[in-house]
């Protein structure tokens, strides 16, 4: 159940998600996306330091710095594709069409993914992270009304 904590070894989780880990952020590809998670009508914080190990002075190419939900993609290569499933793999929180973090989409409760305020079909783990893409995951009673953000106010230069 949320909130979901950070994993004990963020470097191992990042590598398991197929991501590069470096002592510095990559510079070949640099953009930001944003994630909101809503469970039973309440926001769940996306923690800072997903994909970051201050102890090992290492950082994944896909990471968070704070709990605003901003996802940083700072990669050493330009042509790699990044997905929401990779972020959740680093976070060590299960994400699939069947549910999120132990919460099952069973008909009574649903998991719906949105991009730019529009519902998406399929497995939310496959959602591609794109520049300034607003992604929202909503879990809760089927048919419940939830205000889904259409966009995020990215700081200048982000």
For each predicted feature, which ranges?
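Ubiquitin-like/PB1-type beta-grasp interaction modules and other compact soluble beta-rich domains
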Residues: 1-158
